[in-house]
């Protein structure tokens, strides 16, 4: 709190939960696999209130497409999912909003948030410009720093197999 705003980055959901429980001011960000996809639920005619059933059927945000390319007037157009809210716009209680993005946006706009390594690296590598005003926090604390190297390699590493090398000899 001393610095005014921060990111805390940790390796596991259990640590995120522990931090969030102990430090109530932290807003956690969980991955897409932890949330039911409203779009897929809609397609399967599952009530929005029945997220437990959707999760049991594997209808997670990880599997739903947030952006699709469609044809309009002979041109390819990218369309966002109707449930994906826009960051910075006031919350509309009359409209269903994606649970994953709601919690992610709450964390981005909160002074202090807690992320897992994969989500944090994803944010900083691919979405830094899109969320520029929200990611310029003065401090990032990496818990379990002894795992940082492994986490970076897991995020951006390349697997090289002997079969591929044999082809070039």
Give the positions of each predicted feature.
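A substrate-engagement module of RecA-like helicase motors
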Residues: 4-113, 117-121, 166
């Amino acid at each position: 709190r001393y610095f005014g705003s921060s990111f805390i980055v940790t390796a596991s959901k259990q640590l995120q939960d522990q931090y969030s429980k102990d430090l109530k001011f932290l807003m956690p960000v969980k991955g897409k696999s932890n949330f039911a996809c409203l779009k897929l639920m809609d397609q399967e005619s599952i009530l929005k209130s029945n997220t437990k059933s959707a999760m049991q059927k594997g209808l997670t945000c990880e599997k739903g497409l947030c952006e699709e390319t469609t044809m309009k007037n002979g041109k390819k157009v990218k369309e966002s999912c109707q449930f994906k809210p826009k960051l910075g716009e006031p919350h509309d209680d009359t409209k269903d909003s994606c649970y994953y993005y709601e919690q992610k946006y709450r964390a981005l706009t909160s002074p202090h948030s807690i992320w897992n390594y994969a989500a944090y690296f994803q944010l900083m590598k691919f979405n830094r410009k899109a969320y520029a005003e929200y990611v310029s926090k003065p401090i990032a604390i990496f818990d379990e720093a002894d795992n940082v190297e492994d986490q970076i390699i897991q995020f951006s590493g390349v697997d090289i197999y002997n079969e591929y090398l044999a082809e070039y000899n």
